[in-house]
Amino acid sequence: MSVLISQSVINYVEEENIPALKALLEKCKDVDERNECGQTPLMIAAEQGNLEIVKELIKNGANCNLEDLDNWTALISASKEGHVHIVEELLKCGVNLEHRDMGGWTALMWACYKGRTDVVELLLSHGANPSVTGLYSVYPIIWAAGRGHADIVHLLLQNGAKVNCSDKYGTTPLVWAARKGHLECVKHLLAMGADVDQEGANSMTALIVAVKGGYTQSVKEILKRNPNVNLTDKDGNTALMIASKEGHTEIVQDLLDAGTYVNIPDRSGDTVLIGAVRGGHVEIVRALLQKYADIDIRGQDNKTALYWAVEKGNATMVRDILQCNPDTEICTKDGETPLIKATKMRNIEVVELLLDKGAKVSAVDKKGDTPLHIAIRGRSRKLAELLLRNPKDGRLLYRPNKAGETPYNIDCSHQKSILTQIFGARHLSPTETDGDMLGYDLYSSALADILSEPTMQPPICVGLYAQWGSGKSFLLKKLEDEMKTFAGQQIEPLFQFSWLIVFLTLLLCGGLGLLFAFTVHPNLGIAVSLSFLALLYIFFIVIYFGGRREGESWNWAWVLSTRLARHIGYLELLLKLMFVNPPELPEQTTKALPVRFLFTDYNRLSSVGGETSLAEMIATLSDACEREFGFLATRLFRVFKTEDTQGKKKWKKTCCLPSFVIFLFIIGCIISGITLLAIFRVDPKHLTVNAVLISIASVVGLAFVLNCRTWWQVLDSLLNSQRKRLHNAASKLHKLKSEGFMKVLKCEVELMARMAKTIDSFTQNQTRLVVIIDGLDACEQDKVLQMLDTVRVLFSKGPFIAIFASDPHIIIKAINQNLNSVLRDSNINGHDYMRNIVHLPVFLNSRGLSNARKFLVTSATNGDVPCSDTTGIQEDADRRVSQNSLGEMTKLGSKTALNRRDTYRRRQMQRTITRQMSFDLTKLLVTEDWFSDISPQTMRRLLNIVSVTGRLLRANQISFNWDRLASWINLTEQWPYRTSWLILYLEETEGIPDQMTLKTIYERISKNIPTTKDVEPLLEIDGDIRNFEVFLSSRTPVLVARDVKVFLPCTVNLDPKLREIIADVRAAREQISIGGLAYPPLPLHEGPPRAPSGYSQPPSVCSSTSFNGPFAGGVVSPQPHSSYYSGMTGPQHPFYNRPFFAPYLYTPRYYPGGSQHLISRPSVKTSLPRDQNNGLEVIKEDAAEGLSSPTDSSRGSGPAPGPVVLLNSLNVDAVCEKLKQIEGLDQSMLPQYCTTIKKANINGRVLAQCNIDELKKEMNMNFGDWHLFRSTVLEMRNAESHVVPEDPRFLSESSSGPAPHGEPARRASHNELPHTELSSQTPYTLNFSFEELNTLGLDEGAPRHSNLSWQSQTRRTPSLSSLNSQDSSIEISKLTDKVQAEYRDAYREYIAQMSQLEGGPGSTTISGRSSPHSTYYMGQSSSGGSIHSNLEQEKGKDSEPKPDDGRKSFLMKRGDVIDYSSSGVSTNDASPLDPITEEDEKSDQSGSKLLPGKKSSERSSLFQTDLKLKGSGLRYQKLPSDEDESGTEESDNTPLLKDDKDRKAEGKVERVPKSPEHSAEPIRTFIKAKEYLSDALLDKKDSSDSGVRSSESSPNHSLHNEVADDSQLEKANLIELEDDSHSGKRGIPHSLSGLQDPIIARMSICSEDKKSPSECSLIASSPEENWPACQKAYNLNRTPSTVTLNNNSAPANRANQNFDEMEGIRETSQVILRPSSSPNPTTIQNENLKSMTHKRSQRSSYTRLSKDPPELHAAASSESTGFGEERESIL
């Protein structure tokens, strides 16, 4: 019952059900009942904080001091929970204040712990003890302080609590308060006098724990009490150390201000500074450094603060520390200095800081490594550069570390050198250039692969062909290294057990035992020999197994194993040489033996004493044999060589017994004798023994006596080496004579070959003796043939590989000169001779090879006709062959390059393919019709070439078909000349389909190819032409254009110079044809006029080979003799002594026409077949080229069109209207185009000045519309640039000025020829302007060849530098004065012969005079348009020619007037080119009057100035090219005007008044000009041909040069060829009036004594040494030099003519050509350089025609001003 009642009371208390509790308490008086935890209802109510229930229970007599099971009372429960009123009630009841619970805690303790401030205050007021302690002796104040109850701390302190009381560990309330940063508690405690230095747990003081927690304010409070700031914790850390490590900057500063010691180390030895550095706290480090912290104290592992800063990579900290001058050389325990550590971390900034502070680069770590070792091993160029910036430290490159490595060697062991990047190339050697510099990597790899092919049967002769001075010798060493690598000579043999080992060990041990037995005792001898035998075999076993184990610990065993094997193998070889006949080597097809090479070191055949140098070469080869085979083997072979009579038995025999049996018998006798002597001694008693000894001695003695001769031979052979014998023979050359000496050489060479073969058969190797012959092209030419014969005789048998490195042209020339008459009469020439000697020709064409990767071909058919079925096993095998480049294999480093397994597998695959290829090729070649003239030697040569070419193609990852490659190689090998024609055509002609067969191409160009050797001596190097045609027609495989693309870059047997020669001769032929001379033209072919193609290649402007008009196309006229082209007489082809023509002669040109013309022009990308002129035809322009609408009358006479609408005057609507008028535009797109124009506000001014490319992007037209629109814009720009309407004189004489560009109708209206004749002619134009040149390279990027990207060589270099780049100056420096003199003489002869041929019976000299400049200057200048077209082609984008892209109008100020005197020389007679005489030349001095305001020094710089005034584009950088060499070379067809009135004044220069102070200066200047040009005329070709760069195109211009250039440009007047109607307007010039023979007049160009006036128009075309300081390195994006390179000047006095006559001359300028094959004259309208002349005319103004000096001054000034403004507006 009571339990129920009590439960009810407790329940009611817990439920706080007061009414029920009251009711229950009234019934039941027991209020102190407990629950299961021993709690009474009062405890529960006190804990719950229910005051009313507590009061009720107390009123009913509840006991306040009862305890529960944990000794808790109601007071403790109420205090813990903070119920103040209940505590107060309980206190009133007299509760026990000091009662402790189970943990010894009183109510006060709990209240302090829980932070019950009111309860604490109440308990203290009732007398509670504040110093009571609980568990671990913790006081209430400690709990309050540690838990941050500041008010309680204050109350306790006021009530007498101990301020410095401590717990069990000595930790005071202050430490506890500071540990958590309870600032108020700290303040109360400090105020009551708490001890700040008392240490608590872990020796921590209040300051330390406050610092560790980072409580700045607490630290500040504690520091106010002046604590001991240097106290440390148990780890030795002071407060400052802790603050520094933790990064509390403010605390550190406070501590430092309080006077803390900064250098106290902790237990590990680290100082405060090191701690701060390790923590990366920059500000703290600075603060410590300001307090003079010791920076050199070594901490843990001997690391200083500086080292730690470096290790942390903190450059700021390093900089701060370095400012305090630390010791930078203090090492850590690993020996590392800060610099070494920084280098290891690759921290460039820190390294630089340390070096600036003087850290030593020579410091070493424990491995002996310097920072340089580390930097170079880490491949850090910048670090190495920093470390080596002091030149004195360069010596450290050669300081080895403990492993013996030097930085230099470490660098050398890597493929890409760092030191070379720092210092530049250390030395120019094949290994250093790595082949890439010269592009020879693939050549050397492919050749090495061929020559190391085990199945390749020597002897073979390889020809490395390149021009003299091209650096081909660099390839030789690289080839040697590659061959050694391919041959795998670095593999070392390991020790093996063999019977020879057993025999030798038994012999050695037996001999040793005999020795001891003989000297000491027989038993000792036996014991020693057996013991030694056992030791030897134990040693052999260890070596055998140890040498095959991996790991550095067994490296010594490997070394011993290889050395032992080498020596035993050598001993075995010696024994085999003496006793064994060499076995036959197995067939290489069944077992491929490893190959090894021996090289000659002395490979230079000197011109003096060729025999001696050959002897030296063979001697070096014998030395190489001795090094490879050993000293004894090579010398003993001379004695023990196998005679052919020995037969094929295994053993050598003596007296029918194998020699080794006799040898063993003798050895046995000797051993037996010694044994008997050892046992029995010499004792007369032993008669039997003595008899045996005597017989043994007899046998041995007899053997020695019989072999005396052999012993003598052995002795002689050992003492006299092969080198010594050769030198002895050479010293007796005067006695032996040449034949005897050759016999000695031949014997020695044969002995060497036999020795190599014998040793190979024993060692199962293939030895190939490589004879490298360099320098033949430097020999005296009369000795070359002798040297070749000698080499062929000596090395034509045996394992020899002869490598010729020479210039084939020099060699062939020398051979031709020295061949005997029998060979020459039998049609054998130098080419045949060299072809017979050389089995594998390799023409080094590095530029073509370097571009080969552009032509990667992925198609499997490789250009086959789609229907042809050429797939099969071979092609599958082709695809399976690894595509690894040979060059890349060697670049991967030594490990990869020497990985024999990979190399072997790769090469075995290639050899399988090669064998299959050879088999298939042989079958292919035999079945073809053209096989009839292929000899076995030719077959071998073809297979060699195919093999090399195939490797190069594979190396460049070009997929190909072997059959096609073989056909191509046969084509290039048998008919190189005709193949070069095909290639030249493909290079110069774009748009040729890939599938077009070479047969088709050949049919197009065949009639342009000379047919007789008299015309072209190079025909002699070709085979039968009938076989050539049969070959091209052969059914399988049919070669197509694509095959040429694929194979040409890697073709090594075709001389690239052939194409240069063909182009040179062709250019000369065409230029002669242009002059209208009596040169019989090449055959022509009838055909419809071709539309001009942007990629076609007419090499001349008006070639006689290209007139489709009235020529009888089918007539084949005779071709001139070859001397017509060359400077040589006789059949010898002049490889060098031929004219040089600028490279841009050979590239396509494009002729912009009017917009209407473009309507009828087919697409530029058309692939119509070209007619059969090989691209020599001139592009025919429609007559409707003007800006007006085309009419039929445009070809005949008709009214001149109205005034041209200026582009600048058009507004936006007018531009839209103009757009709609363009015929051919897509009408559906016109609204969109007009919208774009209006949106972008494109008016006339915008069109006149904008960049064409930007306009294209903005207009966003389709291709055809854009082409038409662009052409219209460019034509309008061009037309506007020709009109200066504000000049009244221009307006008044507009009808007599030259017709603007593209207006044939206007010209035709004044034509004096009959209309019928004119209309039948085809007007030809060469539209070429300087602004077209000037803007080249400005708006476009790199030249694009969008269609035929494989034509890497469309621009050929000069004759002398076909191997290297055009800028190669190395070769030029090698040209001696003698060579240049030979060039000069050759060109004189060449020009003379050309002139004589021109003056032949068929020449057309209508007025009885011919032109002296026609031969040479036409040769130089007819290519004027070629410059434009060539550069224009480079600008081609998306296969579209852009004639005037981005071109700006070059109009001068409108105040300028046109000077017709500068536009040319009037040719009034019927002669195509008038001779310009001395008088004409004098009149050129009027050009000097253009400089009246200049200083005399500036005027005299006539030849030093560069062409600046051609347009602003000239200021841009230009591409370096030999195109500069020929100057601007404008064509000769710009109209030149002349007046009858001025004819009286011809030659009278001084008639035009000028300022007195300048009266004589221009004359002196021009006389000086003549002197300069006298040599320039003949030296021009020389410098060009030898690669000397023209220096007229300097980018370094000055403004004062521009005006001087104007003077040149005024004299630079161009020639217009006139028709018969003007023949009577000009008389014979005075200076030539006495010369009746036109040849004499023509020859004046070649005379050095009499300077032709045409020479003086060659303004600065080719500088020589005697020119004024103008020798600069130049570059080409501008036109070179002056306008006139070849257009002989029109004198100013001649230009003073009445304009009535000028009108007649201006009407139509025509050339009449009368070739022998043409029944009708051809009139050619040539508008070349119209735009240029008009621009120049605007600059030169009418005032120059006046005789008033002020006007002259005005002309010059207005010109200068105009140019300056123009430049500003454009730039």
Swiss-Prot record:
Bias type Polar residues, positions: 1346-1358, 1403-1430, 1460-1470, 1713-1731
Disordered: annotated segments: 1182-1202, 1285-1310, 1344-1368, 1397-1564, 1578-1633, 1713-1771
Motif mapping: PDZ-binding: 1766-1771
Residue spans, topological domain Cytoplasmic: 1-499, 546-659, 707-1771
Ranges for the ANK repeats: 4-33, 37-66, 70-99, 103-132, 136-165, 169-198, 202-231, 235-264, 268-297, 301-330, 334-363, 367-396
Pfam family, one: Ank
Ranges facing Extracellular side: 521-524, 681-685
Domain comment, as recorded: The transmembrane domain mediates interaction with NTRK1.
Protein name: Kinase D-interacting substrate of 220 kDa
Organism, as annotated: Homo sapiens (Human)
Gene this chain is encoded by: KIDINS220
